[in-house]
């Protein structure tokens, strides 16, 4: 009877303590805290028994469960679409609003170029091709949003007796981000001690190409080491017949396979590897 009373009191105490805190659920962690203020782009909070005020951007918050049981979700985080593979490139968002990428994880720089074939080329279609290419490269990198930093578009120029004409051209550049990185510990737990794998598919995008190419790609892939570089999973490994490449970034994984990204000068690669 005495043990039952002690157990009951322990449960009641823990429940009371939990009820005195708020919980922020971000894309990467659960934060037990006391929410102090919700601003236009961030949530300010402090940890239990601390006065220091911390901030987290709404872009990375899934929801807040307040101590009174109320749940608040944020449209900023739910608006991002998941990239499961290179074919999900249409899920990539392009923005020129800097506040929309606050708190997100930077993946890398991206750029694309599209040019018409003749001086009669449709300028809007050329621009659409450039945006499509930019999204494809971002998806290959595992990003789901691009902050566009530069856009240069030139229309068709008809030639003359002393001057040759030129077709419409669009050049884009920006920075690729994601709202959720693959979890390092989950990836290591999934592959365990296994180090020898086989690839199944390769996606390739040349800077001068208008479309991504996907081919059956059956090579051996050996993992030498796995490191966590500011949340990004990096593999030092050996890809059969590709000895120039040693560093690969894990962009996605599930129970069946994982995908890595690497680049060579102006060519981007995404390789799918069987678990």
Language model segments and positions:
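Bacterial Sec-dependent N-terminal signal peptides
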Residues: 1-23
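Compositionally biased alpha-helical segments
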Residues: 20-121, 125-140, 169, 232, ...
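Extracytoplasmic low-complexity/disordered linkers and repeat tracts associated with LysM-containing
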Residues: 83-86, 95, 103, 184-191, ...
């Amino acid at each position: 009877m005495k043990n039952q009373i002690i157990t009951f009191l322990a449960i009641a105490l823990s429940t009371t303590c939990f009820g005195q805190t708020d919980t922020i659920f971000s894309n990467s962690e659960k934060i037990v805290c006391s929410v102090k203020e919700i601003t236009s782009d961030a949530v300010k909070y402090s940890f239990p028994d601390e006065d220091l005020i911390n901030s987290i951007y709404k872009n990375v918050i899934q929801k807040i469960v307040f101590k009174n049981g109320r749940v608040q979700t944020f449209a900023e985080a739910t608006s991002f679409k998941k990239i499961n593979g290179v074919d999900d490139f249409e899920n990539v968002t392009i923005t020129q609003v800097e506040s929309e990428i606050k708190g997100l994880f930077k993946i890398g720089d991206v750029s694309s170029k599209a040019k018409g074939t003749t001086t009669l080329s449709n300028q809007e279609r050329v621009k659409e091709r450039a945006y499509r290419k930019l999204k494809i490269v971002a998806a290959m990198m595992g990003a789901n949003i691009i902050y566009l930093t530069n856009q240069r578009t030139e229309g068709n120029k008809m030639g003359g007796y002393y001057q040759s004409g030129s077709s419409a051209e669009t050049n884009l550049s920006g920075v690729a981000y994601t709202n959720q990185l693959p979890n390092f510990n989950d990836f290591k737990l999934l592959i365990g001690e296994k180090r020898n794998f086989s690839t199944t598919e390769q996606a390739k995008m040349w800077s001068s190409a208008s479309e991504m190419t996907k081919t059956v790609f059956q090579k051996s892939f050996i993992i030498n080491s796995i490191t966590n570089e500011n949340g990004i999973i990096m593999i030092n490994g050996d890809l059969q017949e590709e000895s120039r490449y040693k560093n690969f970034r894990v962009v996605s994984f599930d129970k069946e396979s994982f995908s890595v990204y690497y680049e060579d000068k102006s060519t981007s690669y995404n390789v799918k590897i069987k678990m």
